[in-house]
Amino acid sequence: MKFNFITLFPEKIKSYYSEGLPGKAIDNKVVDLEILQLRDYSNNKHFKIDDTIYGGGAGMLLKVEPIDLALEYLGESKGTVILLTPSGKTFTQSIAKDLADKRNNITFISGYYEGVDHRVTENLIDVELSLGNYVISSGDLAALCVSDAILRLIPGFLGDFEGSLKDESHNEEGILEYPQYTKPAEYKGWKVPDILLSGNHSEIQKWKEANRKKLPQ
């Protein structure tokens, strides 16, 4: 499985995937990584990848041609093509699991400025995804969030800790984990619930189930 990123800021992607668990996943070939600088696929002598909007409108749009040429370069290895945009379908854990289970290559296209030429959406991608009902300055942030959520569900990512996914802090049903505590048992009068200190595993399990929370819809 391979993650491809089409971006204006390759160093952001490289930096994220060179550290911590994502970096180890790349080193251990859990997934392969390819990062394309979008400007490399511009036919403009100034490497221009955006332009003004037909019909008027504020801001600039990413042009269709550089994105198309980048995808042509990837060829069959592009796999599922995802455009990160505020207008896309809201990304969820169940979508992450579905994409991880398919084991297909994934290409992430980061949006910037006012977005992309709509011909990209109509002809070149498989799905638009959004982190939520808000706008951020760079699609790279969204691409990293989505790719990380998918990556951590791929076997081998957590190594010896794979079993912890069964007790995950958030699963595809939208259930959050129960409250968790560590030492000390009391701090500034704030106490860990007595049941968690009791050693009664069956009662502790009941407490955990009773205190799981549902994500707001």
Language-model regions, residue ranges each:
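Short glycine-enriched loops at secondary-structure junctions
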Residues: 38-41, 112-116
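S-adenosyl-L-methionine/SAH cofactor-binding core of RNA-modifying enzymes
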Residues: 61-112, 118
